[in-house]
């Protein structure tokens, strides 16, 4: 039955995954909600659901654009199933945000094989990875993929090796700028993890 539903890319697949993910996410949020939860809590949780749903579409875009699944939606379905198996992800908003940013980085790294605008793609991927590391520290290890992509595709130009460090500098500047605007609350939040 699942093979017949997800064997081809159809709008019905997105509808099934969207409704099921909304149902399971809603059940999880209602089960975890405090009795005195206000509307801000539910708006924040709905925003996280939209980010999770956007992650599904970014993953589907990556797989279809690069021919990774040969025109079917099994990657979309498997991502949804893994979300259900590891339902503790729903409780940690930092992991959801970090996952979305890492998918954006992987999209840029995979598109590096076209050898068009390589410097921009390396910067974007590094930027998203360093930004994801602010939300979930262990995401920093994905920077190894940037250097592997540089080795595989554009290692001859020495400037490509400097670009990830420029992205690190940019994320650091943005972090400290946002931290100063928010009266050092970001730094204390980051250090308390």
Feature-to-residue mapping (PLM):
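Aromatic- and kink-enriched transmembrane "portal" helix at the membrane-lumen/periplasm boundary
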Residues: 78-96
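Hydrophobic transmembrane alpha-helices of multi-pass, membrane-embedded glycosylation machinery
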Residues: 103, 141-153
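Hydrophobic alpha-helical membrane-interfacial segments at the cytosolic entry of transmembrane helices
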Residues: 158-177
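Transmembrane-helix signature of polytopic, membrane-embedded enzymes
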Residues: 64-82
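N-terminal membrane topogenic signal
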Residues: 1-20, 69
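Membrane-interface alpha helices of multi-pass inner-membrane proteins
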Residues: 121-137
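Transmembrane-helix motifs of polytopic, lipid-linked glycan transferases
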Residues: 50-66
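Membrane-interface transmembrane helices that cradle and orient dolichyl/undecaprenyl
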Residues: 105-120
């Amino acid at each position: 039955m699942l093979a017949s539903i997800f064997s081809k890319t159809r709008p019905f697949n997105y509808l099934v995954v969207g409704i099921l993910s909304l149902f399971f996410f809603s059940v999880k949020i209602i089960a975890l909600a405090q009795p005195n939860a206000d509307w801000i809590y539910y708006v924040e949780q709905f925003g996280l659901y939209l980010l999770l749903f956007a992650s599904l579409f970014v993953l589907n875009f990556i797989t279809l654009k690069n021919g990774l699944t040969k025109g079917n939606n099994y990657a979309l379905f498997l991502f949804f199933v893994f979300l259900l198996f590891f339902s503790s992800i729903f409780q940690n908003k930092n992991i959801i945000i970090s996952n979305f940013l890492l998918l954006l980085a992987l999209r840029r790294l995979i598109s590096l094989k076209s050898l068009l605008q390589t410097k921009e793609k390396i910067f974007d991927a590094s930027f998203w990875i360093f930004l994801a590391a602010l939300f979930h520290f262990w995401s920093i290890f994905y920077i190894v993929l940037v250097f592997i992509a540089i080795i595989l595709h554009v290692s001859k130009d020495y400037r490509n090796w400097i670009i990830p460090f420029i992205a690190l500098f940019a994320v650091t500047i943005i972090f400290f700028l946002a931290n100063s605007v928010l009266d050092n609350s970001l730094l204390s939040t980051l250090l308390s993890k």
